[in-house]
Amino acid sequence: MTRTTRIDTQEATKHKDLPPVPSPLSLSSNPNPECLMESKSLGRKNFKKLSLDASPVKSTSGSLRSSDMMSIKEPTSLRQKRQRPPPILHLPTASSSATSTPTSNITGSSSASSIQFAQKSPGSGVIVSQTLSRPSSAGGIPSSGYSSLNVNQSNRNVDPDNVVSTDMILNQISNLDLTSMNHHRQHYQNSHHHLPTTNRKRQTVISSISPTKSSAASSSLEPQIQSLPASSQSPIATTSSLKLNNKDLLTLKQLGSGNSGSVSKILHIPTQKTMAKKIIHIDSKSVIQTQIIRELRILHECHSPYIIEFYGACLNNNNTIVICMEYCNCGSLDKILPLCENKQFPTFVLKKLSFAILSGLTYLYTTHKIIHRDIKPNNVLMTHKGEFKLCDFGVSRELTNSLAMADTFVGTSMYMSPERIQGLDYGVKSDVWSTGLMLIELASGVPVWSEDDNNNDDDEDDEDDAYVRQGSIAAERNGQNSPSRSRKNKQKGNGYNSYNGPEGILDLLQRIVNEDAPTLTNKINPVTKLPYDKYLCQFIDLCLIKDDSVRKTPWQLLEDKEHFFKGVEEGVYDKEHKSWAKKIRKCKV
């Protein structure tokens, strides 16, 4: 108790205006209320007596007025009496014209100059009303460069976490056009134009040509090749199925090579997918560059079970383009023919093959307005499942709506149609002619135009005769040796080719134009000693009509379901065909 009295005395000395703390009173068992109040009031003279009795009956001696009671219960506060104006936030606007815009866009009335909205405080649940006001120029008040945000009385009930920025309020609630911020931002960018900017590095994608864009609207093909970056390995342009990178491609073996490039079997390491990589050497000639881009474009846009699937392409710094495509493990038809029994394709295989080629040609022309222009055994591949696919669109030409015919002179001469040789306009029917010639070669095992029909020629001229030279190739395929071939190999080495030289090509072209079309009708198979299939001969004759106006289109030939193509779509020959394809696959291994 002594310690408490000492502390109270020290506190009292700090406040000189207060009287000293009186000593505690010893209260009896029944203390007097008046004495108790006197001790609690510290003996102050200005203390107003209060009654401790809670009963409604008041004593006559200690009665208080109602005004005194109210003053005690609700003490006055200077904060409540103070009349301070609401805070005004000055906000810059776009211009004087922007501030003088009528506010009818906000409230729906031309005389309205403020917006009221309610905001609920998540903590206390109190609804706080706020006012957004703008000085109106319609009432004669000159418009200033500021708008005012008026918050009623005080903002102490607003949750700070729920406060929205002024720009957002003006933009979302009052829909004001804050063009000043865009103006200041543009001014800042103009004034800081010397700051360094990061430019995104442009990558050239060779094959990502949108199929929806017309070729007329796109730029020319030649400048695209010339603008290719001279990097060591440009990124591979891929489809959506695979993400290719040149470092992820592992070469397994070489499949073949030609004048324009080579083909090899590769492995995509991340997916363990086997692919075929075609390397094309870029020539400085714009014609070669156009052919490369055309092949990439066609491969990228074609999606058909009868067309080889395209995975992507890349450009190397050694003037080569790498194309990754689907790998067909059985190879091309010219490699499959020597593996067949009797070096001839069975009739059921020829039916499946013809259906696949005509379906692929129909898809190319009807969907992309494309003619292949180079149908031959080298450009038809087969998988181990017996699926036939068209490839090598290097000399194909994409036709536009205004150009339905092509007038160029390219392709393999042996499979060219008469209208192409004569320099006439040709279309998709030219591929039908090439298909018929290829079927004769696969069915008989002997290349077309190889038989020497001019038996009256002298033997001394057989070395210079193109027919005899072609017959030497036929003898080679049958396992025989030809003296003319041995002499030619001594002169030209392994690069011996039939109809080599201007005279040979001229003889071949003259035969295609002047002689009757080749046929298997009424001919005997030299191996089986039996006539060829009747429907096969009829189908080949329809393909080899010399008058292209009478010759049928691929889709017209596919309509014949009762003769040559009977049972093909129904899968009558599927089991036998797959068994044959497996045998070919085993022979390839």
Swiss-Prot record:
Positions of modified residues (Phosphoserine): 402
Composition skew (Basic and acidic residues), residue ranges: 1-18
Ranges annotated as biased composition (Low complexity): 24-33, 92-121, 206-220
Swiss-Prot/TrEMBL catalytic activity: L-seryl-[protein] + ATP = O-phospho-L-seryl-[protein] + ADP + H(+); L-threonyl-[protein] + ATP = O-phospho-L-threonyl-[protein] + ADP + H(+); L-tyrosyl-[protein] + ATP = O-phospho-L-tyrosyl-[protein] + ADP + H(+)
Entry keywords, A to Z: ATP-binding, Kinase, Nucleotide-binding, Phosphoprotein, Serine/threonine-protein kinase, Transferase
Biased composition (Basic residues): 185-203
Phosphothreonine PTM positions: 408
Comp. bias regions, Polar residues: 57-69, 127-136, 144-162, 221-233
Region ranges (Disordered): 1-162, 185-233, 473-499
Enzyme Commission number, as recorded: 2.7.12.2
Protein kinase domain mapped to chain residues: 249-565
InterPro entries referenced in this protein's UniProt entry, alphabetically: Byr1-like_cat, Kinase-like_dom_sf, MAP_kinase_kinase, Prot_kinase_dom, Protein_kinase_ATP_BS, Ser/Thr_kinase_AS
Family statement: Belongs to the protein kinase superfamily. STE Ser/Thr protein kinase family. MAP kinase kinase subfamily.
Protein name: Serine/threonine-protein kinase STE7 homolog
Provenance organism: Candida albicans (strain SC5314 / ATCC MYA-2876) (Yeast)
